[in-house]
Amino acid sequence: MLQGTLDRIVLQLLSAEPTNGYDLTQRICAISRDTLNVNAGSLYPALYRLERRGLIRARWVQTENGRRAKVYSVTAAGRAHLTDQRETWARFASAMAAVLRVT
């Protein structure tokens, strides 16, 4: 995965719905049809990095089975950052598509 891509994916998915790390990895895998398999060794450093930057926040919740889980959600700063990054990502994706069409 390209540098920064995981951060972008995490922000995008958390903007749709707050969730815990395990469910986030499952959603990434399902949405990408098993193309993107993110392990805990990559995901949790990304979550901590985004939290330190103030783009997401974490809170502990009690699950249905009585366990505690850390749920992550996007902050206002994270939503603004995501909006800015959408244009950048669209340009990047367009450029990559053009390069990949070269024969």
Regions inferred by a protein language model and the residue ranges of each:
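Beta-hairpin "wing" of winged helix-turn-helix
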Residues: E51-R68, S73
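Accessory beta->alpha helical hairpin/"wing" motif in late/C-terminal subdomains of nucleic-acid enzymes
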Residues: V74-G78
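Amphipathic alpha-helical dimerization/coiled-coil segments
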Residues: S15, R79-T103
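N-terminal helix-turn-helix DNA-binding core of bacterial DNA-binding proteins
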Residues: M1-S42
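Basic amphipathic alpha-helical segments that dock to polyanions
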Residues: L43-L50
